[in-house]
Swiss-Prot record:
Coiled coil: none annotated. It comes from the Bacteria. This is Glutathione synthetase. It comes from Bordetella parapertussis (strain 12822 / ATCC BAA-587 / NCTC 13253). PANTHER family: GLUTATHIONE SYNTHETASE, RIBOSOMAL PROTEIN S6 MODIFICATION PROTEIN. Pathway: Sulfur metabolism; glutathione biosynthesis; glutathione from L-cysteine and L-glutamate: step 2/2.
Length: 318
């Protein structure tokens, strides 16, 4: 297959721990050809969704801590997305309007015969924090609103809540509001921009001290290990970007129940790769843009997550 990755600039990637790089390694090892494009390389001309792209190969045995781990194998070119055997969307958030426009282009490309993973429409229709509201039985009590009075009432009823923006990533903008929080109003005014920006409030889950878990679903099947992201002492955010420590562990029975309950439904919508964030017994986020943790799970357990992805992509692309 000729696989196109829509991705951030390669020199900016931390290749030694980047899941997209791990995917590329697995695909190249299985004999597939790789190309890369940036989000800004996508365009429509005369109704056809096209892209500028660069064909690349990963260097065998390269030091992934440096910048010399890949090479261009030909001149940059342009082509319709439908010409590739598979298009893998791996552009990191933020999920801003440019990202939304990109999902539209990917959706149009699919209508023209392109095989895109994850599907453009599916990415757009599953905002990572809002998507959990489809599964209320699997989540902690959750409120989505910009009404500060409603949030205060929710806080009073629950006693201990987490509030966060809907478009944040890496743990940014997340606050824990305990019952006696003296800065409640100031925090809500800031997060909601004085009632003009919708946010999410969730009942605090004490098990966060043991870490939140990233459970990966690939082709409708759960990876048998999660990555528990243990917060720093005094932190309520387990995100690796916020200083959390990643520890791989086998899925529990509850983890498997959560994963299997949502896996088929999400896979059937064109979501080849999904990352569930789980705290205790509850799903807290459904990540569909650029799920990670491939490398950490593989290195700590020996289970080859990138290989599982490559096999699933081959099957899905037909």
């Amino acid at each position: 297959m000729h696989v196109l990755f829509i991705i951030d600039p390669l020199p900016l990637l931390k290749a030694y721990k980047d899941s997209s790089v791990a995917m590329m390694q697995a695909l190249q090892a299985r004999g597939h050809t790789l190309s890369v494009a940036l989000q800004g390389d996508l365009y429509i001309d005369a109704g056809e969704v096209r892209t500028r792209f660069a064909p690349i190969a990963l260097r065998d045995g390269a030091d992934l801590h440096g910048h010399d781990w890949w090479r261009e194998t030909g001149a940059a070119d342009e082509a319709p997305l439908a010409r590739f055997d598979a298009v893998v969307m791996r552009k990191d958030p933020p999920f801003d309007m440019e990202y939304v426009y990109s999902t539209h282009l990917l959706e149009y490309a699919q209508q023209q015969g392109a095989r895109v993973f994850n599907s453009g429409a599916a990415i757009r229709n599953h905002p990572e924090k809002l998507a959990i509201t489809e599964f209320p039985d699997l989540t902690t009590p959750t409120l989505v609103t910009r009404d500060m009075g409603r949030i205060r009432a929710f806080h009073a009823a629950q006693g201990d809540v987490i509030v966060k923006p809907l478009d944040g990533m890496g743990g940014t903008g997340i606050f824990r509001l305990q019952r006696s929080e003296p800065n409640l109003n100031a925090i809500l005014e800031t997060l909601t921009d004085n009632g003009t920006r919708t946010i999410m409030a969730q009942r605090y889950i004490p098990e966060i001290v043991k870490g939140d878990k990233r459970i990966l679903l690939i082709g409708g099947e759960p990876v048998p290990y999660s990555l528990a992201r243990i917060p720093l002492a005094g932190e309520t955010r387990g995100n690796l970007a916020a200083g959390g420590r990643g520890v791989a562990q086998p899925l529990s029975e509850r983890d498997l129940h959560l994963a299997r309950t949502v896996a088929d439904r999400l896979a059937g919508r064109g979501l080849l790769l999904v990352g569930l964030d789980v705290i205790g017994d509850y799903i807290t986020e459904v990540n569909v843009t650029s799920p990670t943790c491939f490398v950490e799970i593989t290195e700590q357990t020996g289970f080859n997550v990138p290989e599982m992805f490559a096999v699933a992509l081959e099957s899905a692309a037909g």
